[in-house]
């Protein structure tokens, strides 16, 4: 359980842990077309990562070099992109600190992340989805008309004929979501696990079952079976499998989860799920953060404090 200990702390409230985390994976990855990268004379993102040079700056420079809407060359796409890049700075809007809920809307790192998104928008590096009935256009990736598509790896974990990106399997590229230069490589994380309900009739059975699921994620034979499935069903190469594992390892080492959605739908609607005009996605659609923050921070602080008080009362 050692490598999921940090992830378990994310759901630590008042000194009690509320999720038995059996695995951690990256919530999103950067998907790219190797052929597009090569034809444009750009550096391969995975190779930049290996060289320690994959960060917000190199990500932005590549978008600047590629983007040309007049030539039907679009930059950043994906409904997951805004949240993924926000979390890659390392500070979510709501988190548990020493067992208590804390809001971070006035944190300098959050401001930095929002300003980064606003800058990408102002430079025309974020695909204008209003031109496409407000839909993402992942198929542009396979057509060489889009540089980066940020989504969960699940988008390319099926028969390649079903991939919405339409990237030929031999040209599929994956990289972690970049973080600020000089920062740890934080990744938005998916925590797979179990919750033991109060009054459960067989808590020892739950513990044993959790051990079994943990074993399935760490046993060499089980991992080999999963790897073979990726080769057979997804046509992934050994290299792609290794890259995906390394990205998930980053999520285990540097996991970031925003608790806003779990606090309440009201908090989520003002932060992670706020849409294009308010909250954490709005900067990527031209909404300046200082104004946005002023509108939501007091209300979010109040709503989160109410829930934190309720958790404290339960303890």
Where are these regions (language model features)?
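Glycine-centered hinge/linker elements that transmit conformational signals in sensory
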Residues: 60-63, 98-131
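Conserved C-terminal helix/tail region of periplasmic/extracytoplasmic solute-binding proteins
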Residues: 198, 203-204, 217-315
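Extracytoplasmic/periplasmic substrate-recognition and gating elements
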Residues: 163-234
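Alpha-to-beta junction loops
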Residues: 72, 142-152
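Short helix-loop capping/hinge motifs at secondary-structure junctions, enriched
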Residues: 36-44, 199-206
């Amino acid at each position: 359980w050692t490598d999921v200990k940090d992830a378990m702390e994310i759901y630590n409230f008042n000194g009690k842990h509320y999720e038995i985390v059996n695995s951690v994976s990256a919530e999103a990855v950067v998907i790219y077309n190797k052929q597009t990268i090569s034809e444009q004379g750009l550096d391969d993102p995975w190779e930049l990562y290996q060289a320690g040079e994959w960060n917000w700056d190199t990500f932005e420079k590549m978008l600047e070099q590629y983007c040309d809407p007049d030539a039907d060359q679009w930059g950043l796409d994906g409904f997951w992109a805004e949240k993924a890049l926000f979390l890659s700075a390392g500070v979510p809007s709501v988190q548990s600190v020493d067992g208590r809920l804390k809001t971070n809307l006035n944190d300098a790192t959050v401001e930095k992340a929002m300003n980064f998104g606003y800058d990408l928008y102002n430079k025309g590096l974020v695909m204008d989805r209003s031109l496409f009935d407000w839909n993402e256009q992942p198929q542009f990736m396979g057509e060489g008309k889009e540089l980066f598509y940020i989504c969960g790896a699940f988008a390319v974990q099926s028969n390649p004929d079903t991939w919405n990106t339409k990237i030929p399997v031999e040209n599929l590229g994956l990289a972690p979501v970049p973080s600020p230069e000089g920062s740890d490589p934080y990744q938005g994380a998916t925590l797979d696990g179990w919750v033991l309900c109060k009054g459960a009739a067989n808590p020892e059975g739950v513990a044993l079952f959790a051990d079994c699921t943990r074993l399935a994620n760490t046993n060499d034979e089980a991992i080999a079976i999963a790897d073979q499935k990726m080769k057979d069903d997804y046509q992934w190469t050994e290299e792609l499998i290794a890259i995906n594992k390394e990205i998930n390892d980053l999520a285990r080492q540097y996991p970031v989860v925003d608790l806003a959605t779990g606090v309440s739908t009201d908090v989520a609607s003002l932060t992670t799920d706020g849409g294009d005009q308010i909250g954490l996605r709005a900067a990527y659609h031209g909404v300046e953060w200082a104004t946005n923050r002023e509108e939501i921070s007091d209300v979010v602080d109040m709503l989160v404090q109410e829930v934190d008080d309720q958790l404290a009362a339960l303890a």
